Regions:
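Non-heme Fe(II) oxygenase catalytic core, chiefly the N-lobe of the double-stranded beta-helix
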Residues: 2, 6-227
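Catalytic core of Fe(II)/2-oxoglutarate
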Residues: 213-262
Length: 262
C-alpha cells in the first residue's frame, strides 16, 4: 500500500524522542522501581522531523491502511475526571463508536488513562497526586506478543476462542478540553515504518510483564497531527490486529509522541 502523500500539506518542525542505538533489551517500570533502579533503561535520542497537518486529508486515511483514523464524535460526558460518569457514559459511547467505525460485533473497554500536562513533571514519576503526563517518547503500546497476552489477561479462558476470529486493540484518543494548544498527539503512517525500526521492550507491572515497542529513528517516517484538535474530534490508533502477523509492515500500528510543539 502507498504511504500518505504529503505534498502541499501544511507542516511544522518538531523534535521527536526516539530510542538511541542499543544492544540491550530496554526495560521500563509502570510503578515505582526498586531503590536505585531507573524508571527506564531506554536512552532517548532526539531527531527533528516534519509533522504534517492531518485534517485536510483525514477522510482518505483509515485504520486498516495507516494504523490511525480521525473521526468526528461529540461526547455527552460533562466531567471526564468523574470516574463514575466516565464509565457510565463514555465507555458505552466508545463501544458504539468503535462498532460503527470498525464493524466490530463485540467491543470491550479494558482501561482508560487521563493525561494533563504539568510543566516540569515526568510521567509516572510524578506520583498519584499529579495527573499522568503526556508520553514524550516515540512508542507503540502493544507488540504482536503483548496483544495476545492482553487478550488472555482480559478474557481468561476465552482468549483462544476469540482468536479464532479477528481481534484488534484500538486506542480512542480525544481532547477533554479544546482546542489543544500544548502537547498535541502526533501519529506516524505505519507504512513508513520498517520492522527493523521496532525494538521490543519490557514493561514491568506489579503483577505481570508487558511488552511495548520502542522505535529507532528513520528519515522515512511520516508524521501527522491535528492542529488545535477539538473535543469533538477523536483519533483512533490501532495497536494490535490478530489478522496480521507483522502489524507494522502491514500498516496496523500507530507510533505516538505527545509533545509535538508548534
Amino acid at each position: 500500500m502507498r504511504e500518505i502523500a504529503t505534498e502541499g500539506l501544511r507542516r511544522i518542525e518538531a523534535s521527536l524522542n526516539y530510542l538511541a542505538p542499543t544492544d540491550e533489551r530496554p526495560v521500563s517500570y509502570a510503578y515505582p522501581p526498586p531503590l536505585g533502579v531507573p524508571w527506564s533503561t531506554a536512552r532517548e535520542e532526539a531527531h527533528t522531523a516534519p509533522i504534517y497537518d492531518l485534517r485536510p486529508i483525514a477522510r482518505n486515511i483509515s485504520l486498516d491502511e495507516a494504523g490511525f483514523q480521525l473521526v468526528s464524535h461529540r461526547s455527552a460526558v460533562e466531567n471526564f475526571w468523574d470516574e463514575e460518569e466516565l464509565k457510565r457514559v463514555y465507555y458505552p459511547e466508545s463501544v458504539e463508536l468503535l462498532k460503527q467505525v470498525t464493524g466490530a460485533t463485540r467491543v470491550h473497554i479494558f482501561d482508560h488513562t487521563l493525561r494533563r500536562r504539568v510543566a516540569g513533571v515526568q510521567d509516572r514519576a510524578a506520583g498519584r497526586e499529579v495527573p499522568r503526563q503526556p508520553a514524550t517518547r516515540v512508542h507503540v503500546d502493544q507488540t504482536a506478543t503483548s496483544g495476545v497476552t492482553r487478550l488472555q489477561h482480559a478474557f481468561p479462558g476465552e482468549a483462544d476462542e476469540l482468536l479464532r476470529h479477528r481481534v484488534a486493540i484500538v486506542n480512542v484518543w480525544r481532547p477533554i478540553k479544546s482546542p489543544v494548544l500544548d502537547a498535541p498527539l502526533a501519529v506516524c503512517d505505519a507504512r513508513s515504518v520498517a520492522s527493523d525500526d521496532l525494538v521490543a521492550s519490557d514493561l514491568l507491572y506489579r503483577d505481570r510483564r508487558g511488552e511495548t515497542y520502542n522505535v529507532s529513528y528513520s528519515p522515512r517516517h511520516r508524521w501527522f497531527y491535528v492542529p488545535e484538535m477539538r473535543a469533538d474530534e477523536v483519533l483512533l490508533l490501532k495497536c494490535f490486529d490478530s489478522a496480521f502477523h507483522d502489524v507494522c509492515d502491514r500498516g496496523h500500528n500507530a507510533l505516538i509522541v505527545k509533545r509535538c510543539g508548534r
